[in-house]
Amino acid sequence: MPRLKRDDLPDAATQTAIRGRGILCPFSSAAEARMVKHILVAHDLSPDADLALRRAAQLARQCNAQLSLAHVCEADEQAAGEQLQAHLDQLGLDDVRLWLRPGPTVEGLLTLAGGIEADLLVLGRHHRQSPQGFAGTTLERILLATPIPLLLVTHPAIEPYRQALAALDYSRCANRALHAAWQLLPPEAKLHALNIEEVAEIHGADPAALALQVELFGQLIDDTRTALGADEGRLSYSLHQGERLNCLDAAISELQPQLLALGGHSRSELSHALLGSLTRHFFDNPPCDVLVAR
């Protein structure tokens, strides 16, 4: 898997041509880097939802954010509310606002998220038993419709996140995902941004193309570090050539992140009604908690 660092740069003429193209970081730092102030966790009375609640509670404490718990159902609201309140009391979460909403899950949850101005939506892996996996589930419909980042929690919140990995390209949604992930990390945690120049592995590496990509991506990372106030020790990066999934799987194996951040759109971003293949793959087979922004 070919890999270059920024020391391996194009020649002077190529660098001049790159700068002349006016490559800019495609996001508004003020909007993308906003702090997490209100976390909404959806709970369906399942063990998977308990994982999400515990992680959301840890993040709320870390970020000094308000935590709300939502249950949307068409059955007995009172019984569900009593069960959830007892569960919150058992966990010692006495400062959590409990919301009970009737009606369709997706509409009820997203309407509530907008009404309380939530910055982050947290869910468990409710589609684990679905024969179709992630496809066609309530979780997929929520992800397709939510305007705020969504965190899929799959592992126990034993400790704060220590290592995050962001698949970063030049799309706005990938940049939003990286910024959202950064806000969920404590000061001692690290984030690694991975850029992949997709080529068929049978064709081998193209050193000239990869060197050009190093310069472009390096500019993006410099802008991102400035926006986040991050240094090289906390926000690192690397570039790879190869097939996207293979490169990302290799990075996950090497870094062992507790959090994976992805942009939610298809690569063309032509349609907000489409999800990228990487997002679908990792929601079906999450190696860790997965954060998606659209």
Question: How would you describe each model-predicted region?
Answer:
Residues 100-108, 239-246:
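Charged docking surfaces used in two-component/phosphorelay signaling
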Residues 57, 85, 140, 179, ...:
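Active-site phosphate/pyrophosphate- and oxyanion-stabilizing loops and adjacent acidic/basic residues
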Residues 4-8, 16-28, 32, 108-158, ...:
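Gly/Ser-rich helix-loop-strand patches that form or flank binding pockets
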Residues 68-70, 97-101, 151, 194, ...:
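General small-molecule cofactor/ligand-binding pocket signal
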Residues 30-79, 163-214, 222-234:
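Small/aliphatic-rich secondary-structure junction motif
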Residues 210-262:
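Glycine/small-residue-rich hydrophobic helix-like segments
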Residues 88-94, 227-232:
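Short helix-capping segments at alpha-helix termini
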Residues 133-134, 177, 202-206, 247-250, ...:
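Short, well-ordered secondary-structure micro-motifs
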